[in-house]
Amino acid sequence: MKYILSLNITFLCLISTIISAQINITYPTSRAVFQRNNSNQSSIYIAGNYTTFTDKVEARVIARTMTPTQGTTTNWTVIQLNPSNGYYYGTLNVSGGWYDLEVRHWNGTTLLGTASLQRIGVGEVFLIAGQSNATGDSDLKNQGNFGPRANDDRVSVVNYTVNFPTNYGGVVLPRAEFSRLDSTFNIAPFGVSAWCWGALGDTLTKRLNVPIAFFNGGWSGTGSNAWRESANDSTATPFNFFTMPRGMPYGNLRAALHFYVAQFGVRAVLWHQGETDNVQEVNRDTYGNNLKMVITKSREHSGKSNLAWVVSKASRFKGFQIINSRTWQPVIDAQNDVIGINGNTQPNYTTQVFEGPITDGLVGPNIRTSDSIHFVGNGHRILAGVWNQRLNTTFFTNSTPYLPIPPPTLTGDCNGVSNLLITVSNIYSSPNWNNNFTADNNLSTSYSYSASSGNYRVKVKDSNQNILISPQINIPTNFSGLIPIISQNSGTWHDFTTWKCGRIPTSIDFVIISSGQEVIVSSGLTGRFKRLELKGNIRLFNASKLQN
């Protein structure tokens, strides 16, 4: 006796059993802040791994308890149906706020497991640029002048700095791991200390009631000529009191735009620079042209044509041939030209540039150091205060925020019994597979990588050379129940050569019979599965059966 099961019939598990299972969250990471849009919304991309057959993954965010109340808790939302390969990836729309993230996974009506991640934010992301009153200074830091820490839990940075000297082409930034900003922390990629940004972060979180993240691509002591030269030519070595590494100082800003800003989004670049142009006596037209060039290149390189800049008006300097502290009006006039204060017919006027704080008048004891250049003591808080005044409602209403670019998704297919062939789409370029914590070692530069047990990610570039990192995929030693078992040719159920994975299906596997193929369960044997999808045929002989 025999019978044939028709095409396109799907057998589903009829009896649910309680299975001990685990699920984790590998993306995002704790304290990450994602840029919101002007409607107070952003997409959070969520990914992780699970260890048993799953047909649905859900997620929600829970607003952390704070005074005043903040955030909007969401309901459980399906982020992926029928994930495969022990890996899930989905998206959740979230309002501005500071959250704990939860995920859970199901098999039918059976809840298999949950996982949680504390402190995930949707708020405002800023990229700082300029010279030492933007970055802090390593010598001043060693003297104890580093600015106040952030007291609010919601002020996030990546505590990392690019080693000096590094050419632009040699900058490899690590995967972002966020911390609350402490006084002596670096602010990736090249910020030296908290400076005024911890105090500004506290003020903004209190005022806006959303988390704040800072990145810092400035360089102490740099003039606008060096910024223009390196923005225009990534191999240039500008002379700025010394010969700078190739592509610097702009290279650090560009690296941050391509890496951190691509992944987390951005509201604006905050620019504080002009003191060095005072001592160099740069004229108005030159400074304006330099700054306009840097802004234009930042938009061109990042693919963000309306990237907002907030330009502070700064020029005060003392030192070298300048015996007494002075300001330099040509720099201030040029900054006003770029902003548009002198009208939009000025040749260096640039759209989407906003007026920053006027800082030259901030002088006095416990405001600046003896050189009358660098802020110190209460001066950091005063500087933060004037920045806060300029980041006003008009600025947030009229600036164009850029939300994070989705991280690349991964697909997987078994490559023998113990390897998984993981693949990233070829819409990207320069794939770089890695398996270390910082995601900066290089295992392969192919679009697919055959991997054994372990944790893997891939770095890729988009059409604007932005660098994106996939969420981590965990490849277990035993694939049973995680990877669909697919027929690769007609044959018998209990012959491993019938199956693409080279493994006979078991009661925990999702089995697919491919179109145009027929699989035979031999007499007296049982074909076991968890879920069965028929695109081809199954043939049963006497006393043979299927069982789930």
What are these language model-derived features?
Residues 110-122, 465-479:
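Edge beta-strands of extracellular beta-sandwich domains
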Residues 442-456, 511-515:
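Solvent-exposed segments in extracellular or luminal domains encompassing
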Residues 482-548:
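Extracellular beta-sheet-rich ligand-binding/adhesion modules
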Residues 102-104, 457-461:
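Extracellular recognition modules
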Residues 22-404:
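Cell-envelope and extracellular/periplasmic
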Residues 43-47, 416-426:
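A short beta-strand segment in extracellular, disulfide-stabilized domains
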